[in-house]
């Protein structure tokens, strides 16, 4: 059965001129492979406004699966996130100058939400194509985690039939010309996200493999 997969990517932030999350996601708009039919939307790197845009995208597309994607400069792998926490703690301002500290995303909401995606399976499928990938256990405390938590809160409260989650991606090479940081080509990032969408559409259950972090 075909599943509509909504992918979201952010606009540039923190002085960058591109955001690879949107550059990759927009390439996949209208793509179809296996059980996945993909639609793409951009969200602003702004606390709360990003959630409002996401809610409108849900109304517009009525997806079965939502995968939000964000840039994690410094990471070397495609990293599906395991958990979102109920905390805004911004080291830098967002794109409208907001810099919340020690603030709950949802007053009265749970401390954390688990992903609804088969992230270990996604990682294995991406690695089969020679693309580095690993499960991540922290999505940070900036707008990426904010959107991830807000997505799972929205799903839990209003759309229990939707499965959702978040994937962080590295810089693309053009972002590292003036700094020493790992990067991954846009082609490989795009390929990995397509694999993630198809895998999520094909499988609800995750695989049982060892993982975790020691510190």
Swiss-Prot record:
The active site is at residues 81, 144, 168. The keyword Hydrolase applies. GO terms for biological process: proteolysis. It is found in: Cytoplasm. It catalyses: Release of an N-terminal pyroglutamyl group from a polypeptide, the second amino acid generally not being Pro. One of its GO terms (molecular function) is pyroglutamyl-peptidase activity. Pfam families: Peptidase_C15. SUPFAM superfamilies: Pyrrolidone carboxyl peptidase (pyroglutamate aminopeptidase) (SSF53182). Keywords: Cytoplasm, Hydrolase, Protease, Thiol protease. GO terms for cellular component: cytosol. Coiled coil: none annotated. It is an enzyme of class 3 (hydrolase). Belongs to the peptidase C15 family. Homotetramer. Removes 5-oxoproline from various penultimate amino acid residues except L-proline. HAMAP family: Pyrrolid_peptidase (MF_00417). This is Pyrrolidone-carboxylate peptidase.
């Amino acid at each position: 059965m075909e599943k509509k997969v909504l992918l979201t990517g952010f606009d540039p932030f923190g002085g960058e001129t591109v955001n690879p999350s949107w550059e990759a996601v927009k390439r996949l708009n209208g793509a179809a492979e296996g059980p996945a039919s993909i639609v793409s939307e951009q969200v602003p790197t702004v606390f709360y406004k990003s959630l409002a845009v996401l809610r409108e995208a849900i109304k517009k597309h009525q997806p079965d699966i939502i995968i939000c994607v964000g840039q994690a400069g410094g990471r070397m792998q495609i990293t599906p996130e395991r958990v979102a926490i109920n905390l805004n703690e911004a080291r830098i301002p967002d794109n409208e100058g907001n810099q919340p500290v020690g603030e709950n995303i949802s007053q009265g909401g749970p401390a954390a939400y688990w992903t609804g995606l088969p992230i270990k399976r996604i990682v294995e499928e991406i690695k089969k194509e020679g693309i580095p990938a690993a499960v991540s256990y922290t999505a940070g405390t900036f707008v990426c985690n904010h959107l991830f938590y807000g997505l799972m809160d929205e799903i839990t409260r209003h759309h229990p039939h939707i499965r959702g989650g978040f994937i962080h991606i590295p810089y693309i090479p053009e972002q590292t010309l003036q700094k020493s940081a790992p990067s991954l080509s846009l082609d490989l990032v795009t390929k990995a996200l397509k694999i993630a969408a198809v895998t999520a559409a094909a499988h609800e259950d995750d695989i049982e493999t060892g993982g975790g972090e020691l510190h």
